A protein has these predicted regions:
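Active-site bordering "gate/hinge" segments
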Residues: 1-289
Length: 289
């Protein structure tokens, strides 16, 4: 039995203390400074907290606009993490110097991934990078090591993925453009306020948003997903690295339409609903209300 239970965390940053005795509008702006990658989520959390406190129900249009803003951040974050923050853990640009560009085109076609980049020109660019010798944090048993690294990809796939790594810099910026149009700027949006949004949609803005979203969608379908499927077989063993306890929690995102009796009910009816996966949890052991 568990007569007393505690929950603790090791990531206290004190932002709640910073916003004490400030107006709700201030809080929504201040807490975003926690992160330059995911400020929208922090702003949303602050605005929702204020709305709960004051009993405010936002309009359906405001709900849609907030979901679009959160979705743009999702697009940016997924592209950023898969390519620009993590890809160099499994993609070796210097190994791409051994690639035959013609074979790289054949492999890209076979893998169903895009061939928008000039692989010949990229290989020349990488050669200049290697000749420069200034590999920064990647020097010493990283890109330039023959042994002792965990890189598994063949040279042609390294060349393809390096090209797409560079393309991803542009694509994640386009996702941030969507956030900037809706939020006034990105990072740290300005239009997200308790009670709704200060963004005023126009035909021109909506057309621009649609064009950017379509471009990102096409790139993810033609590049990011095929790249993932091409890379994964070389790192199957990594699926067991850093394996945790098998307990997962999600708070949900993208508020659905309608009125809900409680905030918990609203969270459960999000397009990506909240939930917990924990096969080891036995609630019968919990005796607290």
């Amino acid at each position: 039995a568990l007569p007393i239970s505690w929950v603790s965390g090791g990531c206290f940053r004190g932002m709640e203390m910073v916003v004490e005795n400030r107006t709700p509008e201030d809080a929504a702006q201040i807490v975003q400074r926690i992160c330059g990658v995911c400020p929208v989520s922090h702003a949303h959390s602050s605005a929702i907290a204020a709305e709960k406190a004051y009993g405010i129900k936002i309009s359906n249009n405001a709900r849609i606009i907030r979901n679009l803003l959160e979705g743009a951040q999702f697009l940016h974050s997924h592209i950023l993490w898969f390519y620009n923050l993590a890809a160099l853990d499994y993609v070796n640009p210097l190994n791409a110097l051994k690639a035959d560009p013609a074979d790289a085109y054949d492999l890209a076609q076979a893998a169903g991934t895009s061939m928008n980049s000039d692989f010949v020109a990229l290989k020349e660019r990488l050669a200049n990078f290697a000749d420069n010798g200034q590999l920064s944090i990647f020097s010493g048993n990283w890109f330039d090591a023959e042994d002792g690294t965990a890189y598994q990809l063949p040279p042609e796939l390294d060349l393809i993925c390096t090209a797409h790594y560079l393309e991803a810099l542009t694509m994640q910026a386009k996702a941030s453009q969507i956030s900037a149009i809706i939020g006034g700027k990105m990072p740290h949006v300005m239009t997200l306020v308790p009670g709704g949004t200060a963004f005023v949609p126009t035909d021109q803005k909506l057309d621009e948003l649609k064009a950017l979203a379509d471009e990102i969608y096409d790139w993810v379908e033609s590049t990011m997903i095929p790249d993932t499927l091409a890379i994964a077989p070389y790192y199957i063993d990594a699926l067991n690295w850093g394996k945790g306890c098998g307990r997962y929690v999600a708070w949900g995102v993208f508020e659905g339409p309608g009125d809900y009796a409680s905030y918990t009910e609203q969270m459960a009816n999000r397009y990506l609903p909240m939930g917990v996966i924990d096969d080891k949890l036995n609630l019968s052991d919990v005796q607290e209300n």
